[in-house]
Amino acid sequence: MSELQTTPSPEIRLKENISKKPETMTKIFWEKFSKNKLAILGAVILFIIIMSAVFAPLIAPYPQEQQSLLDKYKAPGLEHLMGTDKFGRDIFSRILYGARVSLLVGFASVVGSILIGTVLGALAGYFRGIVDAVIMRVVDIVLSIPDIFLLITLVTIFKPGVDKLILIFCLTGWTTTARLVRGEFLSLRSREYVLAAKTIGTKTHKIIFSHILPNALGPIIVSATLKVGSVILAESALSYLGFGIQPPIASWGNMLQDAQNFTVMIQAWWYPLFPGLFILMTVLCFNFVGDGLRDALDPKNIK
């Protein structure tokens, strides 16, 4: 007697395909991202830096403000891994605490600017007309002003401080995100699923945030990752010029400002070297991760 062969019904096969699709998309993303060795290296280094900043009070061998004039300009060694500064403060400890400030400014500023830019860009791209014209003219005006001039002007008005810097970067950093999101919405608003949602009477805010926005998240995530590195670099530049984070709060930028004396750079080379290396390494790692995410989230790579 021949064995009965059962085949799954079309409905069962459809359910199986639907349930497997998200897993397949995730797998494709990870395969693409993991092939970028620089992105993986950048992610690992960033994880170490972030964890070191979070647990700085447990890792730092000395309090960040502990001074010892007898240990002034002490070279790197077992007692002070990265040497000391002009007040005898341990540079390694100050770099760990400075990472907390620089990363806080970077992440908080990007979250705020991404939220503002996404909302305004979505409104401009979806409604077009007068809404689009007004928002884009504001974007053009802000982008027409040199970044460093605009930042220094706002810092002078609001006065330096961590919270003030975050606010300033939010107010100046949303424009590129708004332009990016607007472009995505202009290309997605005429898709079939959006037209179908309009036809059945779906509310406008639900179409924007539930139907269109999820399909524009890829470029937004990539932009946010790259912007963190840019904000950290800008904060360091402002602090180096004396317009950013002010002592006694440690940041990588004001540590470089303390070491800008030519004699210090020659005789105590470790003083400017290590803060500069951490700024460079962190910005590069964010760029590496951003490039990896851009390649992995490219729709051409997800079939």
Swiss-Prot record:
Transmembrane region(s): 39-59, 103-123, 138-158, 165-183, 212-232, 269-289
CDD domains named among the record's database cross-references: TM_PBP2
InterPro entries with a match to the protein in the record: BP-dependent_transpt_permease, MetI-like, MetI-like_sf, Oligopeptide_permease_AppC, OppC_N
Record-linked Gene3D superfamilies: MetI-like (1.10.3720.10)
Subcellular location: Cell membrane
Coiled coil spans: none
Iron recorded as keyword: no
Pfam family, one: OppC_N
Primary localization class, coarse: membrane
Keyword Transport: yes
Annotated ranges, domain ABC transmembrane type-1: 99-290
Cleavable signal peptide: none
Swiss-Prot/TrEMBL GO biological process terms: establishment of competence for transformation; peptide transport; protein transport; sporulation resulting in formation of a cellular spore
Job description of the protein: This protein is a component of an oligopeptide permease, a binding protein-dependent transport system. This APP system can completely substitute for the OPP system in both sporulation and genetic competence, though, unlike OPP, is incapable of transporting tripeptides. Probably responsible for the translocation of the substrate across the membrane.
Stated family: Belongs to the binding-protein-dependent transport system permease family. OppBC subfamily.
Name of the protein this chain belongs to: Oligopeptide transport system permease protein AppC
Species this protein is from: Bacillus subtilis (strain 168)
